Amino acid sequence: AIEEDMKKNNGLITMEDLANFRAEVKNPLSVKYRDFEVFGPTAPCGSWTTLETLNILENFDTKSMGHNSPEYLHMFVEAARHAFADRYHYLGDPDFVDVPLSGLLSKEYAKDVSQQINKNYAELENSYEGDPWNHYSDIEIHDPWKYESRNPNAKLKNGDYDQNSDCTTHFSTADKNGNLVSCTQTAVGHFGSKVVSKGLGILWNNGMVW
């Protein structure tokens, strides 16, 4: 059915592509956050952004700030901003580009980054104009390589892409019993190609970013 869809709609995926694809089973990433051990899939998935955020937050006494207090929310947002600045610059497939995962997830690195956070006001968003993913893809504001035991083979370079493209659709839903579902789909353009495979219900994307 997939091959038929591709042929009918001038798609790029062939039966040979499907036959040659192999799923890779890899060890998950993990960090210790206070009394918890938190796991996430390794790169090119972006879970290390969350793990880095937790590592940064661990350097602050968030419990004393109070749940969802202005002080707590400020520290969380600032930690996430720093982690996402790294994500926009370093996220990639380790099979094709060097990603300093050990450095990004080291406790020493997180402590270094935490010392750059101002407790009184936001700083990162005031330093540039435009979208953060465009800005930080070109500029590294931290150096996780200092916390790696190796040197980079090749650093990520910003490629050609549509500066105004939107590539991720997200929705959350809940029922009366408190069951929650959070879904994020990256299909490049808004809803990808806007074509759904007849009978399969697959929404085809319109690009191969990662």
Descriptions of predicted regions:
Residues 1-39, 43:
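Long, well-ordered, tryptophan-enriched scaffold segments
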Residues 30-32, 37-40, 49, 172-173, ...:
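Structural recognition of the beta-strand scaffold that forms the well-ordered cores
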Residues 26, 33, 48, 166, ...:
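Short, solvent-exposed loop/turn segments at the edges of secondary structure
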Residues 190-205, 209:
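A short, polar/charged loop-to-alpha-helix boundary motif
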Residues 39-47, 168-172, 184-196:
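Glycine-rich phosphate/pyrophosphate-binding beta-alpha loops
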Residues 11, 60-186, 199-200:
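Internal maturation/activation junctions in enzymes
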